Amino acid sequence: MIGPLESVLYRDGATMVERHGRRVAANFGARAGEEAACLKAVGIADRSDRTTLDVRGDVDAALLALAAIGERAWSSYAGPERAVVRCEFEDTAACLAALGSASDVTRSYAAIAVVGPNAEALLDAADLPSSAVTLHEAGLSWEILVPPALGPVVWDQLLEAGAPLGVACVGLDAIENLTASKRLRA
């Protein structure tokens, strides 16, 4: 399936791969340079390969149950009786089991990771739409979820707002290597 960010990813030089039925950027030409950008400034990456779950009702109880999964899932309140949960594709079944009554809404969002020491500054500088949900994954890693039609617009806004901060387009190869090596911890 074509991902919601594919047009801007190709435009910006991505080498595309398929992950869990979605096409995402593996790299933008040089994994080492992409990793360096994430460690020294800020990188943005397509994270449409992950699962997005919608939780409604007794959100506090659901998120408490989800805590048993640990760092494999992260969440954000999206209203008084609603939360959005993100996890790696392979952890989807465990998250759904822990949450009880969550809905898989992965295809309802474009997901953009914002990673690095300048990530918070970029999030502050970007003019994100009111429909955006921002989640703090861990350490220096954040995610922005927006409706698919807004994905390319938000990608471009992040590139523009992030230019003074040293923003770079980053592929999953770099993100996954940094995550595995735990070099993105604050």
How would you describe each model-predicted region?
Residues 1-186:
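Basic, glycine/lysine-rich polyanion-binding surfaces/domains
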